[in-house]
């Protein structure tokens, strides 16, 4: 039901979860599109009890995301660029050649490990990825936003967040490190951690380094009470 596929529903879900689990005081991390809902939560709800926020490989602004994607696409071999341009002009996102070309992008910037990534078999009873929601709200690929989030942009509202912020991204992330430093300058109290040799899926590429970065941030927040 596409009526339910709205930003507000996912934002409200954060409140529902906090109330159900009685999470009065929290540090909240949103990864990728999770950061979209997290920043919307912080701006529209102005929630109490949030000690800090982590925007991990964040989608804060669709214009910024597409600008980053354009830069990263321009670094691909010209043959791959031409293939992507050809099929996007035709709006044919299922052609085998196009899928191979997009996988080349993903292998560089989505995950630095073997692509495609196989699901974690240890996560039992976890439903598969919902392509319908992804395509409706986002689009056909990571670098082509055609869905309801196409015009999303909260970067101008970052200075409204008074809680400590950590912007974290992979060295080769779709959310480019340069953009993280841009967001830091737009924020009141923010720091940046760049995870070496990681793509967008930082917690898969470099889980130990992510843990260390988050721990440093938490210690900094707790020590500055």
Where are the regions that the model predicts?
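Conserved hydrolase catalytic core segment
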Residues: 24-68
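Alpha/beta-hydrolase
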Residues: 74-75, 81-163
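Catalytic active-site module of serine/aspartate enzymes centered on a nucleophile-bearing elbow/loop
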Residues: 189-225
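Flexible "cap/lid" loop of the alpha/beta hydrolase fold
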Residues: 51-93
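Active-site loop/oxyanion-hole signature of alpha/beta-hydrolase fold enzymes
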Residues: 1-33, 212
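A conserved amphipathic alpha-helix that caps or lines the catalytic cleft of carbohydrate-
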Residues: 18, 41-42, 184
């Amino acid at each position: 039901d596409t009526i339910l596929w709205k930003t507000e529903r996912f934002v409200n879900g954060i409140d529902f979860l906090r109330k159900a689990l009685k999470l009065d005081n929290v540090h909240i991390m949103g990864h990728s599109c999770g950061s979209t809902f997290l920043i919307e939560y912080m701006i529209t709800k102005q929630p109490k009890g949030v000690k800090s926020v982590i925007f991990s490989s964040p989608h804060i602004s669709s214009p910024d995301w597409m600008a980053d994607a354009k830069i990263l696409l321009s670094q691909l071999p010209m043959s791959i660029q031409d293939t992507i341009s050809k099929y996007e002009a035709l709006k044919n996102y299922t052609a085998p050649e196009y899928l191979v070309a997009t996988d080349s992008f993903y292998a560089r910037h989505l995950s630095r490990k073997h692509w495609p990534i196989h699901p974690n078999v240890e996560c039992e009873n976890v439903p598969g990825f919902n392509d319908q929601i992804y395509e409706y709200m986002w689009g056909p690929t990571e670098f082509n936003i055609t869905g309801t989030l196409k015009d999303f942009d909260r970067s101008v509202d970052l200075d409204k967040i008074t809680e400590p912020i950590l912007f974290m991204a992979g060295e080769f992330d779709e959310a480019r490190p340069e953009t993280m430093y841009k967001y830091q300058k737009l924020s009141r109290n923010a720091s940046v951690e760049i995870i070496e040799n990681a793509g967008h899926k930082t917690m898969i590429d470099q889980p130990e380094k992510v843990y260390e970065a988050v721990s440093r941030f938490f210690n900094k927040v707790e020590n500055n009470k």
